Amino acid sequence: LPTLLKKASLFWFCLVLSSQLFADPQSSNLGAGVSPQRALLDQYCVACHNQGIVNSTTVDGESILFSQLRGLGLTLDTENVDNVAENPEVWEKVVRKLRVGIMPPPDNPRPDNASYAAFRNWLETELDRASSTNANPGRTQAFHRLNQTEYRNAVRDLLDLDIEVAEFIPPDAPDQHGFDNNAEVLSLSPALMERYVSAAHKVAELAVGATPRSTTIKTYEVPLNLIQDDHLNDDLPFGSRGGAAIKHTFPVDGDYRIKVLLQTNYVDFVRGVDQAHEMEISLDGERLGVFAFGGDAPGTPAPYSYAGNIRGSDDWEEWSMAFAEGGFEVNVSVNAGPRTIGATFPREMWEPEGILQPRLFGYHLAVTELPDNNPSVGAILIEGPLSVDGPGKTPSRQKIFSCIPASADEEPSCAREILSTLARQAYRRPVDGNDLQGLLDFYTQGRSQGSFDTGIQFALERLLVSPDFLFRIQQDPSGVGPGDSYAINDLELASRLSFFIWSSSPDAELLNLAEQGLLRNQDILEQQVRRMMNDERASAFIKNFVGQWLYLRNLDSHYPLPAAYPEFDENLREAFQRETELFIGDQIHADQSILKLLNADSTYINERLANHYGIPGIYGSRFRKVELDNPQRAGLLSHGSLLTVTSYPNRTSPVLRGKFILENLLGSPPPEPPPNVPALEETGNDGRILTMREAMVQHRENPACRVCHAAMDPIGFSLENYDAVGKWRQEFANQPIDASGTMPDGRVFDGPAGLRDLLLDQPDDFVGTVTEKLLMYALGRGLEYYDMPAVRAIVREAAKQDYRWSSVILGVVESDPFRMRRAQL
């Protein structure tokens, strides 16, 4: 009986609630003497967001929607909208929901668009006014560990040594916003500390040129589905096709063995051996050897192993011996340091076009893997050193050994000079006697066990595991009260700036200015930002910020289903990523408006990508900037990179695409879906393949899903003309694609061009989201409600300069959250 009473009570409560939801807004008694803002909330919002719902108890059988409202905890009936300073956190949440008009939910009364926009603008203005009298710059973590990329770059700039960082330390997981430089998730476990200790030892050995304890073999694999019919790399000879060029750091001067393996499929079959071919191996562009193989070519063919008759055909029996496992080898004397090893095929006047299909487990071999197609490079192996001639004159040794002691008496002073120089850059601050003595103690220990170089190696190992190197450390200065805001010092500002733009330590110029206390000067700070953005190290900004903001990093782990999209290969994957990186990098360096991301009529493509997009007249593997005359390819939203990572392996997903745009371009991420959401039905009851729109109509029958999908789905459907690998199409399931949509606020649009216009119609929302992402990345923390006034201030100033990239980046650097910090409470 009690349960029955509870259900009855819930029924009557929901009945009353629904009558409020669907009441005629004009008939509501708004009350006398209330503000327009209070009246609007009472009329359109309080029916769902009130303390009665929030404080109600859970009842068996209640709807998911009712549970969601309770869990949201939003009580707009008790919040004082006339004084938003009392609870700015709540009102910033409201502002975010108002961005795309997601509230009130579909089919509920809502204000007219003018009233809606006026209420949002009023809220933002009041929040900004309240913040101006009590600004909170937020608090970054006191200990901010370098992530994997930052560690690699810091080692590179410190020692002039580019390491394969993945061999030493694992990648870092991104935070909830998609960035892997958030201090809160960059913890240091005992196991990870062991990896850093091991990495320090190996890096120090390599940097000083210590003789390796044993011969090693390093293997560089070439992706199986990389098509090698064209010239692929500028480090390979002009007029060659396919192959690979890899960068390898040789530890010492000496003899090494270079071995090249041909690409095989999943049963070790090597293609192309019925024709005569040549393989060329080079070192830094100089030919080391040419090997003839295949057909009746002279020379030593690759070793064979028998694999049997695959299908019983006479033709296959004839070629069943053509399995290469031994590869091609050359021994060479190499000077220590970074070198480029190339393996490629000299291009013939005419040769067949080979297409290596991806692995199709469970299927027969593709016809394009028959033996009369082009061979390709599968791996390059470096073995050595087979003999050692000495440490050599490597860039890292030249960077480390700023002095060479002529006698034992000169060694202590030389060691002090070397270590003080390295420590200053590694610790990103001036070093004192205690810093230096700790390193000299390790130098002395190493010197007693070997040479002067060994002593420096020991000290370098100690430096690379120091908390001052592995962490960016910020401490509250003395004299600052709990919770007070203060300006960070120039050295902290230098590190914050360099890790924002370069993902690395400050260089000498930046450190010198910081030590002199000049960096906080606004003119000097702006000059440094522009200098750094024009430095080649700023490529890290494109790679890391853009790569994570726009999910480009996800391309490496995204595999469209070969049976559905056989045209997708490694060449296309690389072209997708390169296009977006070059596209955005060009706009930043040209200081264009951020809005150009959406409607630019140019992009960067090569022949492979041009063919995929249907753009004629582009030849060769080199990327070049092209003007577009087809609006289907205008702007970022037409890039294959974004369209692929926001699709499933076997089909497009309006939900993923809509969610991506809401979260990353409009700053209005939808909440997580309720548990146990069923998968989309791909066929109807009659067995007919459903269009995506038909499948989503069924899905939205759940009221708990309808609210979020009201905004996600129209945006996602606008891109439905692009398939799951970004190719334009007019039909799906033998039916014309409907790419039209209506936003919750009533705005109607059609296709990608309509979506672009929709985004450009409210530029502050798009630029504001880019600014939020930039500020998150720059600070290494998520943004809070108290950061939003600073974001809006940056956007307002940027609007005066047509939202140019420089105005937003400089706005971030000059903002209170970037230049200030709040003391521990």
Give the role of each language-model region.
Residues 252-253, 335-336, 433:
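Surface-exposed loops/turns
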